[in-house]
């Protein structure tokens, strides 16, 4: 590896532009087809006419962000293939979501997940949860910032902020339907980018066996680690337990994901979309792990990060691309288009979701406007949040390693909300005071461990980064280097302030549940007559149906046979009968 800088050539720019124009063309096409949509509901939910396959691919694409494309391989490169255990958490989280949250949210036909909280608890709980949701603007800022890290390896100037123009154009014209079908194209682009890197690496190394052998020698094949210590960064338990809580928060409570499966034409399509999405997530994770092992195979004797050739581990994969694909004009452009597409998909998802939450939770309850005006306001909100998200990208550069930053944001925001929604759906006796104070306590717990991590970060003995070396570096721009990162030793001191970042969401969620139950028992349990119809599932029913792998919709009276979700939504607004 010479260390000489490579830049994209004309052919790469052409491929980059053509690929993104293809994505834009799909968005514009569906925008044109839906140009006569006359309501804000159609704009924000796609008219509830989307099929399972399209929604499943959109679910995958919306969380296969540029952060995922860049950070997951870097995580495997530094900490090993044990990261692949996250695939188990995908399955557990989707089963939990499909059997607990999906029947309730789909039946209620809500545009905003936080509308449920007012039906089940109180207006104050709904507003606080909405405020927490808007902290996800920081995550969207990370997603916008990530392509800048990649593009700096191949372009002489930052161009990532221009992505917002494409996102906003699709949103302003086509709403959720345009976003979903654009996601379908973009996920194909993302996988094509991954595969171009993996295939070239395998060819250069003479087969996948060489890559696996290098990984084994370097300690990257480290699946046998069942340490229960919660302070360890990655073990089987932190990845499975923390991952299950984290992904349950994403699919069970996070507005962009709920908004997608609620846009399906039937509940069967919605459930199928969730499970097909698991396959997409598994393929994404597998590609990330293999890419990370490829990184180590190429850089095992000369780590570009330690050698100062890149400023962040998240730039390692783009650095490899420019090193091994520079002679294949067009392929580097395809990879950078994949990173860019991943960012576009997630940003468009977030903007559409924030517009939906603002419309349903803040504007509609207070102001009576015509559907035409509501539609215009929805488009205006998309523009506003797009501008704010670009501004948040400036803060993202201060947040350190992107994968850990994303998990911390998810822990602070997602953990307390997962606990609150789980209380609402599964615990009929929890009252409004229990819900509100459970949310506050969960948020306080999540914030406290986050502050603890900032003040007293996890020591190397707990994070256990694997050995990296620069002894094989021979850069033309400087002298030789000889720097080897030693393998970590056993820690001499444990600090409770620094659990694995994957447990932040667990701490926030369990605190919300425990405090919510205690407060409800102390202040008087909620009575059956006080429930809005359709907001609670009996825990016993939920357990039986999940255990038997059958639908939990039989708790309700005919989800598709009594006029559909829309008719049911009107019914429950005038009824306070408990379905349990």
What positions do the PLM features span?
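Membrane-embedded helix-loop-helix hairpins and adjacent transmembrane boundary segments
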Residues: 1-580
């Amino acid at each position: 590896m010479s260390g000489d800088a490579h830049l994209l050539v004309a052919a790469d720019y052409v491929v980059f532009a053509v690929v993104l124009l293809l994505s834009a063309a799909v968005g514009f096409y569906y925008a044109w087809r839906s140009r006569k949509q006359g309501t804000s509901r159609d704009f924000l939910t796609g008219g509830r006419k989307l099929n399972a396959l399209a929604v499943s691919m959109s679910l995958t694409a919306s969380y296969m962000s540029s952060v995922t494309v860049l950070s997951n391989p870097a995580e495997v490169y530094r900490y090993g293939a044990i990261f692949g255990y996250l695939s188990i958490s995908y399955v557990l989280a989707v089963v939990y979501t499909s059997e607990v949250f999906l029947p309730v949210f789909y039946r209620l036909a809500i545009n905003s997940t936080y509308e449920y909280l007012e039906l089940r608890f109180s207006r104050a709980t709904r507003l606080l949860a909405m405020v927490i949701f808007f902290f996800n603007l920081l995550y969207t800022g990370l997603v916008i910032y990530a392509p800048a890290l990649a593009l700096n390896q191949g372009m002489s100037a930052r161009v990532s902020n221009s992505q917002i123009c494409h996102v906003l154009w699709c949103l302003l014209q086509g709403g959720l339907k345009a976003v979903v079908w654009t996601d379908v194209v973009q996920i194909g682009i993302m996988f094509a980018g991954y595969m171009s890197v993996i295939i070239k690496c395998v060819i250069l190394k003479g087969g996948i066996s060489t890559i696996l052998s290098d990984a084994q020698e370097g300690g990257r094949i480290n699946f046998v680690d069942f340490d229960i210590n919660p302070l360890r960064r990655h073990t089987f338990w932190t990845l499975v337990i923390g991952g299950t809580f984290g992904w349950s928060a994403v699919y069970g409570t996070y507005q962009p994901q709920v908004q997608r499966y609620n846009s399906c034409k039937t509940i069967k399509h919605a459930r199928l979309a969730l499970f097909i999405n698991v396959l997409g997530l598994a393929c994404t994770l597998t590609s990330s792990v293999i890419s990370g092992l490829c990184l180590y195979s190429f850089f095992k004797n000369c780590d570009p990060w330690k050698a100062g050739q890149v400023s962040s581990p998240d730039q390692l994969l783009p650095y490899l691309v420019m090193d091994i694909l520079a002679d294949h004009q067009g392929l580097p452009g395809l990879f950078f288009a994949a990173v860019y597409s991943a960012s576009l998909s997630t940003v468009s998802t977030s903007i559409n979701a924030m517009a939906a939450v603002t419309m349903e939770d803040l504007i509609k309850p207070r102001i009576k406007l015509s559907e035409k005006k509501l539609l215009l306001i929805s488009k205006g909100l998309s523009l506003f949040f797009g501008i704010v998200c670009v501004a948040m990208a400036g803060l993202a550069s201060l947040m350190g390693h992107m994968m850990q930053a994303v998990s911390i944001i998810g822990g602070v925001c997602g953990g307390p909300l997962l606990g609150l929604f789980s209380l609402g759906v599964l615990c009929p006796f929890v009252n409004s005071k229990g819900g509100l104070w459970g949310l506050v306590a969960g948020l306080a717990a999540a914030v406290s461990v986050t502050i603890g991590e900032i003040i007293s970060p996890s020591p190397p003995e707990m994070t256990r980064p694997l050995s990296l070396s620069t002894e094989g570096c021979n850069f033309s721009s400087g002298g030789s280097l000889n720097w080897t990162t030693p393998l970590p030793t056993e820690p001499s001191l444990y600090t409770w302030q620094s659990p694995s970042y994957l447990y932040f969401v667990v701490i926030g969620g369990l605190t919300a549940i425990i405090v919510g139950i205690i407060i409800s028992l102390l202040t008087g349990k909620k009575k059956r007559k006080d429930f809005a119809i359709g907001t609670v599932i009996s825990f016993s029913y939920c357990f039986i149906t999940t255990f038997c792998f059958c639908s939990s919709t039989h708790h309700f009276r005919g989800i598709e046979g009594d006029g559909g979700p829309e008719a049911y939504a009107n019914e429950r607004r005038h009824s306070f009968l408990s379905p349990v």
